[in-house]
Amino acid sequence: HVSGACALAVSYYYGAEKRKGLTGEMLRQALLSSTQSVDRYCTGKYQQYLGNMGIGSLDTYKLLRNIAKIDGIPAQRVGVGDTVSIDLSNHFTATNVLGYTVSVPDLVKIELRGGVMKLTGLKKGRTTIIVSDGAAIRKPIEVTVE
């Protein structure tokens, strides 16, 4: 089942839009973010398996939705004192559990609300923001503050 879903995802990625550049890591991230937990079924005589059933069962529809948005987030340029907004719903299938880390936090002020990330330049320099979906997908945003 998983190998067939992978083949379908690769075909879908390269399909009608003729995109290029799908890497093994991108496919792995999409797969790991496309599962449903099976812990809720571990009740009664199966309670001993609670927490021991791996990451869960693969949701192929969710995989195709994830693979459609697996491409990276474009680099951003922002002036000192200026603000740019990035609608992360264009890059992630679910935006309710997004988190981020910043390589140089004192260069940019970040506000994440409702799937929109606002970046305000604080001082000149370059930093990388890694946005995560709470599962396996991690996308970098290269930010230059001018």
Language-model features, listed with the residues they occupy:
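Extracytoplasmic soluble-region selector
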Residues: 68-146
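Short, solvent-exposed alpha-helical surface patches in non-cytosolic proteins
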Residues: 3-7, 62, 125
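Charged/polar, solvent-exposed surface patches and flexible loops
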Residues: 29, 33, 62, 90
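Secreted peptidase-domain scaffold signal
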Residues: 60-69
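Hydrolase catalytic cores
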Residues: 1-51
